[in-house]
């Protein structure tokens, strides 16, 4: 039997274990793309008997990690499995998790988010139900969607999740005297490199590339370098993806077809304005320095005409 949401009686218990799932899942940030981040907790009575999370793309999913690393496998029968995404029921790089859950006679599955991927999308629930496993859905649903916002945007909107990022002075200038200049404190440069490891790709326009010849690597933080993209006609080095000058919508469609789930845009004013005016972005990350320049290249200034409820904006 499938229940649409958790009952009020068990809500606090379900939320406690689901929050643990989300915490475990978050360890996969930047490592599992383009897969979603998933964590799993298995409970027998009031005791956690196993945990796991999806650690790297191509490796075992969270449910399989938890089940196969359970120190007392005989206790899995009749247990409750918490997972923040609908278990898969198809063969991909790894076997289906739903089959393993059925095989180990787990009694109940509690889920945070449905999986919109057409290869799953309810089929995991069906497999569990047909085996007589009770399924409870939508526990901490909004928190789960936020954690996997890249995945859900990619699946539902068929484009990468887009983050616009720039640095500006205290009075809103990107560069004094229109010249490249490092505005913020050194530790924020490290933060910028950390952010790069979390996204699949990074993009600049041809103007920024010609002026700055940026490396766009994550050399100050441990993790994978993003795919480096330049938009426009330049002589880009090997290892970069060069895309022709085209609309933002067409650019994002091209990246979607290349299975690029998320994108951070670190271009200059022109390319940032193009994304802002298109409305095809999800976050704005602004690193604000302490200095006042009084003149120079003004930073973008999204207004109420370009902001919609799905955009998230914050300052660091």
At which residue positions do the language-model features occur?
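Enzymes that bind and transform nitrogen-containing heteroaromatic metabolites
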Residues: 2-36, 70-75, 93, 160-316
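Proteins enriched for Cys/Gly/acidic motifs involved in redox and nucleic-acid/cofactor modification
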Residues: 31-32, 125, 139-167
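N-terminal glycine-rich anion-binding loops that anchor highly charged ligand groups
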Residues: 32-46
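Zn2+-dependent cytidine deaminase-like catalytic core
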Residues: 42-143, 227, 234, 274-276
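Short, flexible helix/strand-to-coil boundary loops that buttress conserved ligand/catalytic motifs
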Residues: 113, 148, 178
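Short capping loops/turns at secondary-structure boundaries
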Residues: 117, 121, 137-140, 155-159, ...
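Short, hinge-like loop/turn segments at secondary-structure boundaries
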Residues: 126-130, 153-155, 219-222, 301-303
């Amino acid at each position: 039997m499938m229940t649409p949401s958790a009952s009020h009686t068990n809500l606090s218990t379900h939320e406690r274990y689901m929050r643990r799932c989300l915490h475990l899942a978050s360890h996969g940030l930047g490592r599992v793309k383009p897969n979603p981040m998933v964590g799993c907790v298995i409970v027998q009575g009031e005791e956690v008997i196993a945990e796991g999370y999806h650690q790297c793309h191509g490796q075992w999913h969270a449910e399989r990690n938890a089940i196969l690393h359970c120190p007392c496998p005989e206790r899995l029968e009749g247990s409750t499995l918490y997972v923040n995404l609908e278990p898969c029921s198809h063969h991909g790089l790894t076997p289906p998790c739903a089959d393993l859950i059925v095989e180990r006679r787990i009694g109940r599955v509690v889920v945070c988010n449905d999986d919109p991927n057409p290869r799953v999308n309810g089929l995991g629930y069906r497999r569990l139900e047909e085996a007589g496993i009770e399924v409870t859905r939508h526990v901490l649903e909004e928190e789960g969607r936020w954690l996997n916002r890249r995945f859900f945007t990619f699946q539902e909107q068929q484009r990468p999740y887009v983050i616009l990022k720039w640095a500006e002075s205290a009075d809103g200038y990107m560069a004094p005297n229109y010249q490249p200049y490092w505005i913020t404190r050194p530790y924020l440069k490290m933060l910028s490199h950390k952010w790069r490891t979390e996204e699949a790709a990074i993009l600049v326009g041809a103007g920024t590339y010609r002026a700055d010849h940026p490396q766009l690597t994550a050399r100050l933080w441990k993790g994978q370098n993003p795919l480096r993209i330049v938009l426009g006609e330049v002589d880009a080095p090997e290892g970069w993806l060069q895309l022709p000058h085209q609309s933002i919508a067409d650019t994002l469609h091209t990246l979607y077809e290349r299975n690029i789930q998320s994108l951070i845009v670190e271009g200059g004013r022109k390319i940032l304005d193009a994304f802002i005016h298109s409305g095809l972005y999800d976050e704005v990350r602004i690193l604000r320095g302490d200095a006042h320049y009084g003149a120079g290249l003004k930073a973008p200034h999204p207004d109420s005409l370009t902001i919609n409820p799905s955009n998230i904006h914050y300052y660091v």
